[in-house]
A protein has these predicted regions:
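Conserved catalytic-core motifs of GNAT/GCN5-like acyltransferases
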Residues: 106, 123-139
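Glycine-rich acetyl-CoA-binding "A-motif" of GNAT/NAT acetyltransferases
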Residues: 59-62, 112, 138
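Short hydrophobic/aromatic beta-strand or adjacent loop that forms the aromatic wall/cage
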Residues: 53, 139-143
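Conserved GNAT acetyl-CoA-binding A-motif
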Residues: 96-108
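Conserved active-site alpha-helix within GNAT-family acetyltransferase domains
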Residues: 109-127
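Residue-level detector of beta-propeller blades
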Residues: 11, 62, 124-128
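Acetyl-CoA-dependent GNAT
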Residues: 29-87, 93-94
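A short, well-structured alpha-helix characteristic of acyl/acetyltransferase catalytic modules
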Residues: 1-50, 150-154
Length: 154
């Protein structure tokens, strides 16, 4: 897709994306609403296909996007790392090639990727209380939003 300081960003097929999400362990939890710790690879690949998700790898980071069915120029995005450089390149790709004008990230509270989203111009706009069950308890999911202009100026 593009070159970043983290190396090439390359698209993964659903089976490879499922395997890489499983290998990401806890940093992959909540990635586009999925849980690679409790879902097997076949189910993950089927869900990624059903959602028409695009999953990419940039170094050790996984990046994902799903078009919002109610707003075709808006993408739900996910990342597994705090590094903003690959995320910024990915958002630029989505804006330029797929004409996305805004982005929404639903991130488990306390996830490492929060730092990347904030450094790329995302703003916290809300939270879903007790939205996700993990490790014997419910956890909040934080909602972030950014327009294309926000991510390009960061």
């Amino acid at each position: 897709v593009t070159e970043t300081t983290a190396g090439d960003i390359r698209r993964l097929d659903p089976a490879s994306a499922a395997a890489d999400l499983r290998a990401a362990a806890d940093t992959g939890r909540g990635f586009l609403g999925l849980d690679p710790v409790t879902q097997n690879d076949v189910l993950l690949a089927a869900e990624l296909t059903r959602m028409q998700a695009q999953v990419f790898r940039a170094g050790d980071m996984l990046l994902g996007a799903v078009a919002n069915p109610d707003q075709p120029r808006q993408a739900f995005v996910a990342a597994t790392s705090a590094d903003p450089a690959p995320l910024r390149a990915f958002l630029s790709f989505l804006g330029t090639r797929q004409r996305c004008t805004s982005f929404v990230a639903m991130v488990p509270d306390g996830a490492a990727s929060v730092a990347a989203f904030e450094r790329c111009g995302f703003r916290r706009v809300g939270a879903l209380r007790d939205h996700r069950y993990q490790s014997g308890g419910y956890q909040d999911v934080v909602i972030y939003h950014a327009s294309r202009e926000d991510t390009c100026s960061a």
